[in-house]
Structures are given as C-alpha cells and as structure tokens.
Swiss-Prot record:
The active site is at 107 (nucleophile), 132. GO terms for molecular function: ATP-dependent peptidase activity; ATPase binding; serine-type endopeptidase activity. Belongs to the peptidase S14 family. Its EC number is 3.4.21.92. It comes from Corynebacterium jeikeium (strain K411). The gene is clpP2. This is ATP-dependent Clp protease proteolytic subunit 2. Cleaves peptides in various proteins in a process that requires ATP hydrolysis. Has a chymotrypsin-like activity. Plays a major role in the degradation of misfolded proteins. Fourteen ClpP subunits assemble into 2 heptameric rings which stack back to back to give a disk-like structure with a central cavity, resembling the structure of eukaryotic proteasomes.
Length: 209
C-alpha cells in the first residue's frame, strides 16, 4: 500500500530509502508497519480512519489469511457507527487480530481493544483505558423525530453494552452500571476487568532478564 493515506499530524513524518536487489524503494513508518501486518490507530475513530483500517484488514487477510494481524491503539475514541464498522470487520476477517493499547484507548477505542482475539489483547504498563456510554450529540427536531432518535440512542447504548459484555465476561447489566459515568482504568485494572489479557513488560527489561 505505497499510497496509504497518512494521518494528519503536526510533525513531519520521516521517509527513508530501502535498497535491495530489486532497486531502491522510498518508504515511511506506516508502510513499514503495514508490511509487518501492523495497523496503527493513532487518531479519533471516524469515517476516514474506519475506512483506512477496514481496507488494511481486508488486504492483509487477502495476502495471508492464516497470519495474525496486530492493531496498535492510541485513540481518544469517536463515532459509534465508525466503531461498529471496524468491529464488524475485525470479527469478519479470518486472521486473529491482536490488539495492543499504548497511550490510551478511550470510548470507542476501548471497545476495539477489547474486541481483539481472546488471549491476544494487551496494554503497555502506563496505558489508560476509558469506557462510557456512546456519545449522542445534540438531539433536536419535531416530536416524532425525537422519538426516533431516542430509540436509536437506546439501541446504540444496548449494543455497546452487549459488545463489551461479550468480550470482557461481564454481564450487560454490570457494563451498564460501570459505563453510566466515565470509568477510567489503568492497564492492570483493564486486565482485571477483562478488556485486555496481559500487560506487556518493556522489551528492554525482558531482554535484560
């Protein structure tokens, strides 16, 4: 995916040239990660990031349906519909999807973190996970429209609760209680809650031991 769209950022993304028997090839960190079957969600969850992630999942499945895909997450969350689009694609593709939180996985991103393949969900030691109810935005319009929107908000809320319950082992009722207000978890607390399976040690420390 040499034309992969780069996330918006304030710093200059470095590029580098790789030399091989086939000649020279210019690359960048995101293309290099993709070659290693790594997807990086480092922005809010919206239609643009969802489309990019879904495309990468589908292409990586086509390249090798038997090799794991790893998704690194550092995201403040975002759109519920975009979340479910990514979620469905993660469950649809054949490869196992390992999820790793570095930085934060908040709101929609926390659900994606939990949705990784069981036993293959992790967080770095100082990662932060936040779960809460889906954001609804301003509700306005005539009475009949308000009723329709109210039903949709409740449907979204129930779907999010059932999804988190499915992947954490909690009951939907417990998830509703826990997400009624912002619930902030450390990496170890996220492990206890069932959002991740392990907290990764630093590679340097692992190498020294």
């Amino acid at each position: 995916m040499s034309e992969m769209q780069m996330p918006e950022m304030r710093y200059i993304l470095p590029s580098f040239v790789e030399h091989s028997s086939y000649g020279a090839k210019e690359s960048n960190p995101y293309n290099k990660l993709f070659e290693e079957r790594i997807i990086f969600l480092g922005t809010q969850v919206d239609d643009a990031s969802a489309n990019d992630i879904m495309a990468q999942l589908l292409v990586l499945e086509g390249l090798d349906p038997d090799r794991d895909i790893t998704m690194y997450i550092n995201s403040p969350g975002g759109s519920f519909t975009s979340l479910m689009a990514i979620y469905d694609t993660m469950q649809y593709v054949r490869p196992d999807v390992q999820t790793v939180c570095l930085g934060q996985a908040a709101s929609a991103a926390a659900v994606l973190l939990a949705a990784g393949t069981p036993g293959k969900r992790a967080a770095l030691p100082n990662a932060r996970v936040l779960i809460h109810q889906p954001a609804t935005g301003g509700v306005q319009g005539q009475v009949s429209d308000l009723e329709i929107q109210a039903k949709e908000i409740e449907r979204m809320r129930k779907l999010m609760e059932e999804t988190l319950a499915r992947h954490t082992g909690k009951s939907a009722e417990q998830v509703r209680i826990d997400t009624d207000r912002d619930k902030i978890l450390t990496a170890e607390e996220a492990k206890e809650y069932g959002i991740v399976d392990q907290v990764f040690d630093y590679r340097k420390l692992s190498a020294q031991n």
